[in-house]
Each structure stands twice: as structure tokens, then as C-alpha cells.
Amino acid sequence: AINPGQVYGKLDGIETRDPAFGLEAVWIAPEQREHAQTLGYTVVDTATVVATHISQLLSNNAAKLLGYEEVQQLMDMLAKNSPKLVDGFVPDVMPLGSVVKVMQNLLNEGVSVRDLRTIVQTLLEYGTKSNDTEVLTAAVRIALKRMIVQEISGPELEIPVITLAPELEQMLHKSMQATGGEGPNIEPGLAERMQQSLLDAAQKQEMVGQPAILLTSGMLRSTLSRFVKYTIPNLRVISYQEIPDEKQIRIVSAVGQ
């Protein structure tokens, strides 16, 4: 019995955590199922828990499973339907290693690479302008923005987001510029406070059944994503440029105020 964030009573059983998403849960006897559902718990059987956990493990480690051979196979499959798109792409526009790195970057942040046509089209456009895989990944993410936002927040037109206070974001921008784009030099005490504030904001979102999304500038997005990846894994970090035109944002909290 998984606590989705708001339940109306406690259950007798063995307290645990859902292995896939880390939510509070209780192992209960089969005859308690109906009672648990009445209290607001999401009840799943053992097989579903195991299957979901395995699926989550595969998703979390997808980037490690994708290498040169797998990407070449994907290119070969795309070439069957779109030969002109793939012809001359590798290695004329960019080496296979760069394509692999961009796709690994996407998978590392839970972005599907199934829309291979859009990924290749974007790399064809930007690959002649830059060989920086971080820049190329950002360009691909913008091209995939509708899919990214759809997978995070669903079909709702309004997206609830967490932001950084303007003063904090500006300070991080200046720090990033001072390091030549290597990443902001954050004082340890500030980093700890940011982590805690972002964790609190993310947990509040999860408690009301909404996705935890941090909205920030394109310059800071990848750095902040790495900053929270292991401490707040359910917090998705997107940039202003990744919000589709038809979507509206609703700021639920501003960290640093």
C-alpha cells in the first residue's frame, strides 16, 4: 500500500518505501486491500512492485546501456526509412562519439530518445556550428520540449514550477561567467541551504500529487540538474526555452527568497 502523499489513516503492516520512487509504503495482508484503498492508499501486488522497480532501474541506467554499437544500430534503422537524413550525418557532420554522448546526456535526465528523427535533424542543424556536446544536448532538448514537458506534467496547460529567486539566479549567472561556463562556484553553506530548500519545495509538490519541476535559465539548467540528480532525484530541471508556447507556468515557490 503506497502513500501517494495524502491518506486518511494508518495501516497495520510492515512499514517500508516504494523501491521505485521512494514513497512511504506499507506491506499489508491481502484482506486489507479494500480498507487501504478507502484510506487513499495506492495498492499494488508484489509482482507489480517488482516489475516497476526493474523498469525504474533500467530507466535510471539506460545511459550506461547505450554505447557505440547500440547508437549505430539506431542510425541503421533510421536510415531504412529516412536514408537522405542519415546519409552523410556520421562522420561528415559529427563523429559517432558525439552522437552517443548527446543521447547519453538525454537518457541521464530521463529524456526518451525514441524520437530519433528529431534528434538527428537537430544535430544536423547545430552540428556544423558547435562540437560541444552540452550545447548540442541543450539544442536537442529544446527541439523535444513538447515531449519532455508532456512526460513530466501530462496534458495540463498550466505547469506548476519551482524557481530560484531572481537575486540568487543572477548571482549564479555571474559566478558561472567568472568560471568561463565551467559551473558556478557555490560557497558550501549556500549549496547546502539550496539543496535543503529545493528538497522541501519538491516534497511539497509530491505531497499534493504534482510533479516537482525546477524552472531556470538555459545557462544554469544542466549544472543545476547535476546538482540535484542524486539528492533530489524526482526534481526535474527544465529551462525557460523548453516551455512550449501553448503552456502557462504557475510559480509555486521561489528558492532563495
Residue ranges and their predicted role:
Residues 1-257:
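Membrane-embedded alpha-helical signal segments
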